Amino acid sequence: MQIQDLAIPEPLRQQYLGLGIRELYPPQAACVERGLLDGKNLLVAIPTASGKTLIAEMAMHRHIANGGKCLYIVPLKALASEKYEEFGNKGVKVGLSTGDLDRRDDALGKNDIIVATSEKVDSLLRNGARWIPDITLVVIDEIHLIDSPDRGPTLEMVIAKMRSKNPGMQLIGLSATIGNPKVLAGWLDAELVTSSWRPVDLRQGVFYDNRIQFAERMRPVKQVSKNYDDLNLCLDTIAEGGQCLVFVSSRRNAEAFAKRAAGAIKSEDAALAACAERLLEGTPTEMVKTLAACVAKGAAFHHAGLSRKERSIVEEAFRKNLLKCISSTPTLAAGLNLPARRVIIRDYLRFSAGEGMQPIPVSEYRQMAGRAGRPRLDPYGEAVLIAKEAEQVPELFEVYIEAEAEDVHSRIAEPTALYTHVLSLVASGFAGTRGELTEFMNRSFYVHEHKQGRLIHRAIDEALQFLITAEMVVEVGEHIGATELGTLVSRMYIDPRSAFAIVTTLREQEKYADLGLIQLICTTPDMPTLYAKNADLPALSRMLEVRGADIWLPPPLDDDAAETYYRAVKTAMLLSDWTDELSEEKICERYGVGPGDVFGMVENINWLLHATSQLARMFVPKFYGQIADCEICMKNGIRRELLPLVRLRGIGRVRARRLFNNGITSPEELSRHKKEDLVKILGSGIAEQVLEQLHPSKDTGKKEPPSGDKNTNPGQSTLFHFG
């Protein structure tokens, strides 16, 4: 099917032709034949790199040309940013929405395409974004993640809510290959398009005894290292001019492999040296120093312990073919477009708490294998598993290469998932009686899949009972409605169980303590926590003794609850160190984490502190001011004494501390100093910016930003700028 013959807007056609795209891939042509450009719902379940983005683009531009508006839903913020850049180069207005979860973001409605995570879309629905009814097309990328225990329930509810709000809209689900696509397509009332076609031939095999066994042939691999099969496979690819991705089970393994690969590759490229220098800007941690040393020689590791900036540098260098090899945990396979000639799946067993080492699912193997082969760059792609012994070769073929993908299932019936979604349905006006609630849930993927809803109806009753007891929902006769507390909790996008614990504990306290508040938040379901090893317990116990007066929740008597308790305490200690202005490097060293971990924890608790301050403002006002100040301290990583200074735009933790140590403790004191004094402390650019806020020029028309504005100066050393 030729691009020239398609009913798509002429500007898009010319862009495709300019890029050398003259004919559709077979799966893309099948989508057009099934009604892609005629408003039909579609479920497209095809391999990675088979042209899903172009399928979505054609449909979106068709809608935009007809006056419509499109919503593109992704699972990850990083993928949202990637799609935002990609769609923005096609001559339409694109908006990106991944930020605060209590905002309506009405300005987004000015765009033709809005890109957002499923959590953000759920939040926009809860907060009543005015442009939602204008959406004529919803594209759900990675729709197979409806099976995810963490994110699946939210994605399922977003789809159900959008279909309820906009029954006439078109819906396109983009999926990896799954075992039960007909079931999912049936729920979506969608035409099903499946295919095994790929633009680059994928060869899947198992490595053992210096040979790769493919389905129909054997390929020898030169033995460079006697001890490391993964390294031999990697160097074999590089010798032929290709790049390599190596997937391993842990961060430690990823870093260890990158060091070995760097030692073998030994590149001396000036561009790589420049990448390494960029990584070392600021105050690098030991992890980042290791990464920079690897990058300088042509290899890298990639995992969630790195900051967004560091991951971005690695990804960019790999796309430019500067880096020859990346070793990664499976995070890299989840959505990011980073293909390579050969993908090595070294570790196909993963530790699972309570179950020991378990094989990864077929879907995860396929996600990783799908990264093999760069369209228009590689003649083929190879996905290679590594067998430890000869007997494993046929086993790995059977379990992964020849196996069917797993079915996807609804996760919405989990009681803990239902608490938040039942509350949002009631608070957002989707349901005003138990009957309407049941009727809405009867349209869920769960009920479609199981053909009955007895289990989910019982779970709904359990969730409602909790919400009524927690005073978030009231029931009068047959009517149910959200209370002021319930409405706020739904708007703030936190788990009702978190809100109940926070409000209850705050009401019990006579005296406020930052550490007590941080510890409380770290015990909630919304806050991920650090693993507490046995070796950590003495230090944690000492901290509890020393800071006992500031601890709100004492150790549990039940041994089964001890692990959860000490995880929360350890996380609270890390966050307390952050607000005590301990350097990022020392925090990473003390707690055995990476910059990305610290950033993630600060980002999470900062949102929960914001929600807590709003809960306190309405329901525990005696603590509101202190909690609001704690939120600012956490955002900037500062002690309270710096609060007056960081309210100025351009002043973060480093510059505020520098001013304070020079005897300048407030904006008032700062305004009394001469410009030349401030230049010595802050530098000329920031000094002028700060003075302009304190003494606005009459002829510039500039206004001082509102107190608490986010710092925009990239030189500030907070994790939010490193992020």
Swiss-Prot record:
Domain Helicase ATP-binding: start-end pairs: 33-196
One family name in Pfam for this protein: Helicase_C
Record field: catalytic activity: Couples ATP hydrolysis with the unwinding of duplex DNA by translocating in the 3'-5' direction; ATP + H2O = ADP + phosphate + H(+)
Biased composition (Basic and acidic residues): 695-707
InterPro entries: DEAD/DEAH_box_helicase_dom, Hel308-like_dom4, Hel308_SKI2-like, Helicase_ATP-bd, Helicase_C-like, Helicase_Hel308, HTH_61, P-loop_NTPase
PANTHER family: ATP-DEPENDENT DNA HELICASE HEL308, DNA POLYMERASE THETA, PUTATIVE (AFU_ORTHOLOGUE AFUA_1G05260)-RELATED
Protein name in the entry: ATP-dependent DNA helicase Hel308
Organism: Methanoregula boonei (strain DSM 21154 / JCM 14090 / 6A8)
